[in-house]
Swiss-Prot record:
Described purpose of this protein according to its UniProt entry: Required for phyA-controlled responses to continuous far-red light (FRc) conditions, including the inhibition of hypocotyl elongation and the regulation of XTH15/XTR7 expression.
Phenotype reported upon loss of the gene: Reduced inhibition of hypocotyl elongation in continuous far-red light (FRc), associated with a strongly attenuated disappearance of XTH15/XTR7 transcripts.
Tissue and organ expression note: Expressed at low level in seedlings, roots, leaves, stems, flowers, and siliques.
Taxonomic lineage from the root: Eukaryota, Viridiplantae, Streptophyta, Embryophyta, Tracheophyta
Superkingdom of the source species: Eukaryota
Residue stretches spanning the membrane: 7-27
EC top class, as a word: hydrolase
Single GO MF annotation: hydrolase activity, acting on carbon-nitrogen (but not peptide) bonds
Membrane association type: Single-pass membrane protein
Keywords from the UniProt entry: Cytoplasm, Glycoprotein, Hydrolase, Membrane, Transmembrane, Transmembrane helix
Glycosylation sites: N55, N374
Gene Ontology BP terms: de-etiolation; response to far red light; seed germination
Name recorded for this polypeptide: Protein LONG AFTER FAR-RED 3
One Pfam family matching this protein: Amidohydro_3
């Protein structure tokens, strides 16, 4: 099933006629040599295309015409898709053609959950993603300290203690190598961070410091902080961290956007630099200083839909009333975002039963449920879309219950409530997404990080019954939207699609919970038109349909059969608005 967005299930998608069009020739890297100007042809009366894409297998994500071999584009939008015979009338003086030579085209890929500027910033910081040994962790910090000015903050992130056996890092690991530089290293999930002793001293975090509501200071038996702060406790340190300049943030956006284009990403849903333990002003500063600047100076490279902290819902409402939701073809105002719990890796996701590896720990409510309900009620009543982070089974049920109550109180409308992650669901909860018309915004690649550790935290039975229930969500008619949560996981939609289809973790030779694998078509739909619909962007993009923005990706394969079976293709070229922006 494909969900309540009314895209029918397609079986045997490509007819023999389409396959006859697929060439076995290899398409070299696309560049200006592959464009030809068709000046010798007499322009037809009427509309002339700027660009004609021909001789390929074009998957449209549009149920009215799932496949075509050609596509005509004008002024950044799609004129028509179909056979070359039906499109050649758009050829005129100045029409440019790209011959796909049998290659596959898909709509521009949409990442439904990113933190774009955070990702761009992290690319220039101490990158600890994939580090699998304590010595390697410490060496990377030491190298950063040696290249930094005395007293400057050493910032980084991406570490995952499960990669080196589960032992949590502590300030003692890095104190000797960073005596004069405060260090702040965020775990890959964004819900835990390591501070060295100097950073703790600057922030005034001592043994007598109380745990804040919605957060935990990890402590030694003596009561002294270990250096690890979870969720809201991170706010004890973040105000002391050096403020990142406007220029650094602008450069982070450009760096992140260029990287996204290499992965075929043309649109992102940006949840902002908003995490437990951060101020709700960061998202607004980035909007004012970075996004509006990039948009007005025509420096945007990918389309971005912005979500803002739910505590600022009235501010977003005022802005939407003044400007509308579409600020430009590049910049869109989405809705509001909140958190109810933490993360599995930080043992702060909220569950009905305790964590096996930390007895008497059920996780955290990182926001008071009554306050969250009040904010949600007000934001929804004003017409704003609401997206709430929920990972644990209890957290998801709390949000499902709250959404149901809010919808009943505020009346019927097309609200498209979102739950971000929907990672662990109690029996029966997956069906409620479809019943309540709630978007399940999920990140398949997270399961690759969790597969080895979730049984240790929850037990094998709970892990198998509750974790990443993608097919169950589809069976319940939920709208499934795929994303990465970058920089928590890499921004790589083709890899996410492969994970959703295969569910084979690293070093495994079999699928984890194979019954929850989804079909290739469902995964691709969830990364295109469903992702657009999940953010109210489906009238603008998400499918290669006449009138929509001409965002598309050319892949490295000539075979739809192989692509749909192995999902092993790579990105050859990325087009945004009919213009090639990568390579």
């Amino acid at each position: 099933m494909t969900g309540w967005y009314e895209f029918p299930v397609m079986i045997g998608f490509v007819s023999a006629a389409v396959f006859l069009l697929i060439s076995v020739a290899y398409l070299p890297l696309l560049n200006d040599l592959y464009w030809s100007t068709l000046k010798s042809l007499t322009p037809p009366a009427g509309i002339v295309a700027d660009l004609l894409v021909t001789n390929g297998t074009i998957f449209t994500s549009d149920s009215s015409l799932p496949f075509a071999d050609s596509m005509a584009i004008r002024n950044g939008r799609i004129l028509k898709v179909g056979s070359f015979a039906t499109l050649k009338g758009f050829i005129g003086d100045g029409t440019m053609e790209v011959n796909l030579e049998g290659k596959i085209v898909v709509p521009g890929l949409i990442d439904s959950h990113v933190h774009l500027i955070s990702g761009g910033l992290q690319m220039a910081q101490v990158g600890l993603r994939g580090v699998s040994q304590k010595d390697e962790f410490c060496k990377m910090v030491k190298d950063a300290v040696q290249n930094a000015k005395e007293g400057s903050w050493i910032l980084g992130g991406g570490w995952n203690n499960d990669f080196w056996g589960g032992e949590l890092p502590s300030a003692s690991w890095i104190d000797e190598i960073s005596p004069r530089n405060p260090v702040w290293l965020i775990r890959m999930d964004g819900h835990m961070a390591l501070a060295n002793s100097l950073a703790l001293k600057i922030a005034g975090v001592i043994s007598l410091t109380e745990d804040p509501v919605g957060g935990t200071i990890m402590r030694m038996p003596s009561g002294e902080p270990t250096g690890l702060l979870i969720d809201a406790a991170m706010e004890l340190v973040t105000p002391w961290v050096k403020e990142i300049s406007v220029d650094e943030r602008r450069e982070a956006l450009f760096r992140a956007s260029k990287y996204a284009l290499t992965r075929g990403v043309t649109t992102v849903i940006d949840l902002g630099r908003y995490f437990p333990g951060t101020t709700d002003e960061l998202s607004w500063k980035d909007f004012q200083d970075v996004y509006l600047y990039a948009d007005s100076s025509k420096k945007m490279m990918i389309r971005t839909c912005l979500f803002f902290p739910i505590t600022t819902w009235s501010r977003l409402l005022d802005l939407k009333l003044q400007k509308g939701s579409v600020l430009s073809e590049w910049l869109y105002l989405g809705g509001v975002k909140a958190f109810i719990d933490g993360s599995l890796g930080s043992n702060s996701a909220l569950f009905y039963e305790e964590y096996i590896d930390t007895p008497n720990n059920y996780g955290l409510e990182v926001m008071d449920p009554e306050k969250l309900s009040n904010f949600t009620m007000a934001a929804d009543k004003s017409g704003l879309q609401v997206a709430i982070h929920a990972i644990g089974d209890k957290a998801n049920d709390m949000i499902l219950d709250m959404y149901e109550s809010v919808a009943a109180a505020n009346g019927d409308r097309d609200r498209r409530f979102r739950i971000e992650h929907a990672q662990h669901l109690a029996p029966g909860s997956a069906n409620r997404f479809g019943q309540l018309h709630i978007v399940a915004s999920v990140q398949p690649d997270h399961l690759l990080d969790d597969a080895d550790s979730v049984a240790k935290k929850l037990g094998s039975e709970r892990a198998v019954k509750e974790s990443y229930l993608f097919q169950s969500l589809l069976n319940g008619n939920a709208l499934l939207a795929l994303g990465s949560d970058w920089p928590v996981a890499d921004i790589n939609p083709l890899h996410s699609i492969r994970t959703a289809v295969k569910r084979i973790p690293p070093k495994w030779d079999h699928a984890w919970i194979p019954s929850e694998r989804i079909s290739f078509t469902d995964a691709l739909i969830a990364q295109t038109i469903s992702a657009a619909r999940a953010a109210f962007l489906d009238h603008h993009l998400g499918s290669l349909s006449p009138g929509k923005l001409a965002d598309f990706v050319i892949l490295s394969t000539n075979s739809w059969d192989e692509f749909s079976k192995d999902v092993s293709a790579s990105v050859l070229a990325t087009y945004v608005g009919g213009k090639q922006l990568y390579p």
